[in-house]
Amino acid sequence: MMKMRWLSAAVMLTLYTSSSWAFSIDDVAKQAQSLAGKGYEAPKSNLPSVFRDMKYADYQQIQFNSDKAYWSNLKTPFKLEFYHQGMYFDTPVKINEVTATTVKRIKYSPDYFNFGDVKHDKDTVKDLGFAGFKVLYPINSKDKNDEILSMLGASYFRVIGAGQVYGLSARGLAIDTALPSGEEFPRFREFWIERPKPTDKRLTIYALLDSPRATGAYRFVVMPGRDTVVDVQSKVYLRDKVGKLGVAPLTSMFLFGPNQPSPATNYRPELHDSNGLSIHAGNGEWIWRPLNNPKHLAISSYAMENPQGFGLLQRGRDFSRFEDLDDRYDLRPSAWVTPKGEWGKGKVELVEIPTNDETNDNIVAYWTPDQLPEPGKEMNFKYTITFSRDEDKLHAPDNAWVQQTRRSTGDVKQSNLIRQPDGTIAFVVDFTGTEMKKLPQDTPVTAQTSIGDNGEIVESSVRYNPAIKGWRLTMRVKVKDAKKPTEMRAALATADKTLSETWSYQLPANE
């Protein structure tokens, strides 16, 4: 028996050291497919109570010792740092290093961390693990490593480019989001990170995803720059049927903005990580959906075939729109998903969840396919996610786009020039764009508008806006039942062509 075990180990070593050996997503997919055929085993917490019961301020005290960054003794521009377990990050994840010839487990050591004022028994932490990791790269300055990627919790990851700060998150997979049965949160249980060469400008990460009803193999190629791009390939296997599968999910926060002003006096005009969902539909239409913080859970679906892209965007970068010196919402990136290949029929879905403060992510967007295979069958998805502050990259170059949506009390100007509220709600939508700016001011621009059964458009008008060299649409809307949401759409056009993307808005229920 011992001889056979030694022989098996020798065979494995030969495979790993063979010059033809190379780790790939297929190696992870074999594990994912095998897991899908077995019953789900929930991860078990190994945390002592002092770490399990700690508050966020205590968890923040546990800092990685930057002088011990992984690969710090190599010439590669990428470095790794790790997150310690604590709070709800209570189960360890395995992290491996992949080289040209081997796969090696990166072992946890408490020596990696400075625990601050957190009192703990050193013997109780020696057998703990990592909760996740972060990637550092000299993205802003050649002589300084800055954090560009964080993978921590469930299948969440955050990414930034040059001059950006963390904002919205991406996820590996979403299951049954906003369904009455409750959402299932898959988690990355193991990672494999390729050791980069000194000249490499991209980093490859593999991940094994697991949850009660799905498993998956993921390959992330991270390409840092002015815009950081993550190339994603996934192979997903269902253990059991799901109500809804969310592919390429994005998670963000919207508290208030001009389309939904703060109910309390606030020196910040806007407070959000993203202010709209942008969609490039399979038929070529561009759609802009401003975000809400509703009083009740709200879901908006956009059915289409073979989407060309979608994303949660932060449109408008002037500091005066946010006035927040601490959180710098003006520097938070937009995230744009570009599918590779044909994704078939399905929906881009937007979920908006009520929140009272900015600490809760209350916005989710994802692609959900109409048809799902039987459990055990492989699903393949390939796409890129671009994290950018470049407005011009995130809308059609020849289309006008919505610069701002403002909501106001509807009114009518009286003969004495005093404005009198008339029981309507007014929406003021500014459109601009490179081609639109070339149009003469007297161009006969009109609005194509529509509203759902719960509302009536009392008046709509379009006028030239010299401040932005664009056009302003003003609509006064009368809502029939305030307990129900009201859907609206609008676009600008001339007699012979459409000039703008489609403004699509849901006025939330008010009760």
From Swiss-Prot:
GO cellular component labels: outer membrane-bounded periplasmic space
Swiss-Prot/TrEMBL keywords: Periplasm, Signal
Signal peptide: 1-22
Keyword Signal: yes
GO molecular function, one term: catalytic activity
GO terms, biological process: beta-glucan biosynthetic process
Cellular localisation: Periplasm
This protein's pathway: Glycan metabolism; osmoregulated periplasmic glucan (OPG) biosynthesis
Pfam families: MdoG (PF04349)
Signal listed as a keyword: yes
Function summary: Involved in the biosynthesis of osmoregulated periplasmic glucans (OPGs).
Family recorded in the similarity comment: Belongs to the OpgD/OpgG family.
PANTHER family (UniProt xref): GLUCANS BIOSYNTHESIS PROTEIN (PTHR30504), GLUCANS BIOSYNTHESIS PROTEIN G (PTHR30504:SF4)
Protein name: Glucans biosynthesis protein G
